[in-house]
Structure formats: structure tokens, C-alpha cells
Curated annotation (Swiss-Prot):
One of its GO terms (molecular function) is phosphatidylglycerol-prolipoprotein diacylglyceryl transferase activity. Pathway: Protein modification; lipoprotein biosynthesis (diacylglyceryl transfer). It is found in: Cell inner membrane. GO terms for biological process: lipoprotein biosynthetic process. The keyword Transmembrane helix applies. It is a multi-pass membrane protein. This is Phosphatidylglycerol--prolipoprotein diacylglyceryl transferase. One of its GO terms (cellular component) is plasma membrane. Belongs to the Lgt family. A 1,2-diacyl-sn-glycero-3-phospho-(1'-sn-glycerol) binds at residue 143. It is an enzyme of class 2 (transferase).
């Protein structure tokens, strides 16, 4: 009997070592998205609209802090509160891993609310519409970082593109004989996020949606990102053991439950924007 030609994923997560400290691909890809690609695209948008450059500099700081703090606290509160309640000092040990995208999104929204009140004096939707455009590519880079870490993958599959994550202890426990691959959900999500990014770019650059429909771009972003997340979560392995009881009781895991409010908010924003286009003359 011939086994399917699964893809053996034996990627070293460590890029190099600097002064005894490992520099990992995940951190590089995270930085590539959050510090380089995202801000570069955002700056081009700022120049296109001839906005105050000081606004852009302030936005970068607000978003960076909101992303890191929100993502970390999201992981602490949503996925392992008991552990961090018993070990509060571990909350600050971010280099050991543990960032939640739902928490990061909440952190960004709070940061944008503060930014809109203190810096631009414009509505939070004005800020979010412009920030949502490059965020999809940032999210895709983070998921590719998860791939380099051989983490957050899917259930076993007989499909030929299944990945054998042989560096993952979790995979070896799940598939002891390593005779099956698992869904590379990191790639699935990255592709979905890139599609959302492309759609948001089209809305901004080709349809001038940020100035014509308040809330449309961020609505499309929230709906696209978190609907794809909701669907792909169906084939992911659980991140925490207690999620099994959650699935037994409500049929959904934590990632799916947290995605629902964002999808609903996104749909509402899209409907609101289409029904109430901005009518004033554009400069």
C-alpha cells in the first residue's frame, strides 16, 4: 500500500543566534509585517491623501503598543487565565510565546479610539478605515510565522498537501507513527488574509472607499478576516485542553466564539456604510 505523499515540514524556527539569544523567523516575519510592510503601505496612503505626517508617526506608536499589549492580554484572559493568575510575572514574558489575534484586534481598536481623540480629532471609523487596509498583510505574515514555528496547525488529513510537522511535539503526540499529515491551517489563513488585504487595497485605491463610505473598509476587513478564521477553526486542533469541553457544550471552540462579534460588527458596518455614503465634496 502506497501512502499519500505528505509534505514533511522540518523547518528550523531559529534564523541565527546573536550573543547567545536565538533570533527566530516568527519574530522576523512579525516585524516585517508590523514594522516594515504595514507602515510603508500606510505612509503611501498618508501621502496620497496629503495628511499630516505627524499623524502618521503618532499612529505607528499607538498601533504598535495596542497590538502587542492587546494580543498578549488576549492570550492571558481568553486562553489561560488560571495559569497567569497563579504566575502573574509570566504575563510579561512575551518571548516565550502567547499572542491572541482577537486580543490584538481589540487592542488596536482601543488604541485607534485614543488616537482619534488625542491626535486627529476625527472619528474612529476614519482612522480604522485607513488602518485596516495594510493590516491583512500583517496578519498573513504572523500566520507564516506560526508555520515556521510548526504551531497552530490543523487536524490530521489524508489530503496530499497535509504537512508532517515533525519538529512539533504536539504533532508527534497526535500522529504517533507520523504516517499522516495535518492541515496546514497557517497557510490557509495566510492566503485568506492576503485576499482580504487585496480587497481592502482595491476598495481604497480604486473605489476611494475611505472617503466615500465611512466604515466600509474596516467592515470588509473584520468580516473577511474573522469569517475565514471562524471557518478554518473547524479543522484546527484545540490550543488548550479545556477547549474540548467547550466544543462538547456549545459546538464551537474559543477562536470561533471570539470571532462571531467581529463578523457581526463587520456586517453591520458594511450595511451602514452602503446605506449612508458620504455626500460632501471630496478634495
Amino acid at each position: 500500500m502506497t501512502l499519500p505523499a505528505f509534505i514533511t515540514w522540518d523547518f528550523d524556527p531559529v534564523l541565527f543566534t546573536l550573543f547567545g539569544h536565538p533570533i527566530v523567523w516568527y519574530g522576523l516575519l512579525f516585524a516585517l509585517g508590523l514594522i516594515i510592510l504595514g507602515p510603508w503601505i500606510e505612509k503611501k496612503m498618508w501621502e496620497h491623501e496629503k495628511l499630516d505626517s505627524k499623524w502618521f508617526e503618532s499612529l505607528a506608536v499607538y498601533v504598535f503598543v495596542g497590538t502587542i499589549v492587546g494580543a498578549r492580554l488576549g492570550h492571558v484572559l481568553f486562553y489561560d487565565p488560571a495559569y497567569y493568575l497563579a504566575n502573574p510575572a509570566k504575563i510579561f514574558v512575551t518571548w516565550e510565546g502567547g499572542l491572541a489575534s482577537h486580543g490584538g484586534t481589540i487592542g488596536i481598536i482601543i488604541a485607534c479610539w485614543l488616537y482619534s481623540r488625542r491626535v486627529t480629532r476625527k472619528s474612529i471609523l476614519w482612522v480604522l478605515d485607513r488602518l485596516a487596509v495594510p493590516t491583512g498583510i500583517v496578519a498573513a505574515m504572523i500566520r507564516l510565522g506560526n508555520l515556521t514555528n510548526s504551531e497552530i496547525f490543523g487536524r490530521p488529513t489524508t489530503l496530499p498537501w497535509g504537512f508532517r510537522f515533525i519538529r512539533s511535539e504536539e504533532y508527534r503526540h497526535l500522529v504517533p507513527n507520523m504516517d499522516m499529515g495535518c492541515h496546514p491551517t497557517q497557510i490557509y489563513e495566510a492566503l485568506c488574509y492576503l485576499a482580504v488585504f487585496a480587497l481592502c487595497m482595491w476598495l481604497y485605491w480604486k473605489r476611494d472607499a475611505a472617503r466615500r463610505y465611512s466604515g466600509l473598509i474596516v467592515g470588509v476587513f473584520l468580516t473577511g478576516i474573522f469569517l475565514s478564521r471562524f471557518i478554518i477553526e473547524r479543522i484546527k486542533i484545540v490550543q488548550e485542553p479545556w477547549e474540548l469541553k467547550l466544543i462538547e457544550s456549545v459546538g464551537l471552540n474559543m477562536g470561533q466564539l471570539l470571532s462571531i462579534p467581529f463578523v457581526l460588527a463587520g456586517i453591520w458596518l458594511i450595511i451602514r456604510a452602503v446605506k449612508n455614503p458620504i455626500t460632501q465634496k471630496l478634495s
